[in-house]
């Protein structure tokens, strides 16, 4: 009997509820392969850690294929931070030594289940059939036909198409927070010392953790630039080295930016980004609870004047004491 593999298709950010033609074809083709179960969720980076999608994923015991508009390492560590853990599987975009490092890194937090997570970047593919074939090769089922065995074609809509996958509905909004690659992290706590917004904390082993992700200022990647190990990612950032591209040299943060940005080094640039974020509006707070109307003061005095009268009365009372 063929072991079941869960296929997770994460909607790209801002995508409407209906799948585009590319993702639709991929979903149909993979759902037609025996032993593959396809699940559709909103954009992976925007999912709440305690939301229904992450709760569902944490309950899975099977191997997992992740198709998301994120670099594979970023997707892997986003899931890891939410308790969806496993071994990083080799794909065409990840070298074998990189996957081995992620499995055996000394700074990996918590136990690692004996299952594999294969992560694919949807943005790297233009041919859905190529992506389907690479998924099948990665999970050891290369050469299997991917015809629509269930009578579903890539252009079909309606009840039969809807039955091809399982969809988890979850209301999301655009998020911005750091993701730590614990294979690269050396526990220097530079991120904790540098960030002014209370994003970071430490666990029981004094290792850094993203404690308050919602406190991070949107658009600020300063801690990623200051990290000496290049362990901090912002998956939505425009710079591939910060967003988690496995092929982007970590030294690019130190070399290219120094040349492009008028000689600014990473520390100076990070300080400028932090200062700009500090002066920006803080993340939106939840609406305050409505307060009942306060009764008007009993006399014409209020505010500071009333406080002065109370103070004068207190002084007079003290003067009358027989001390």
Where are these regions (language model features)?
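Short glycine-/small-residue-rich Rossmann-like dinucleotide-binding loops
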Residues: 69-70, 196, 228
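Ferredoxin-like iron-sulfur electron-transfer modules
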Residues: 165-190, 198-225, 234-243
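Short structural boundary motif marking the start of a folded domain
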Residues: 3-5, 176
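Intrinsically disordered, low-complexity linkers and terminal tails enriched in Pro/Gly
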Residues: 95-106, 146-170, 244-249, 284-299
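Proteins enriched for Cys/Gly/acidic motifs involved in redox and nucleic-acid/cofactor modification
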Residues: 104-192
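Generic secondary-structure signature for well-ordered alpha-helical cores
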Residues: 31-35, 84, 137-144, 193, ...
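Cofactor-cradling patches in redox/metallo enzymes
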Residues: 7-132
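Flanking helices and flexible, charged tails adjoining ferredoxin-like Fe-S electron-transfer domains
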Residues: 1-3, 213-323
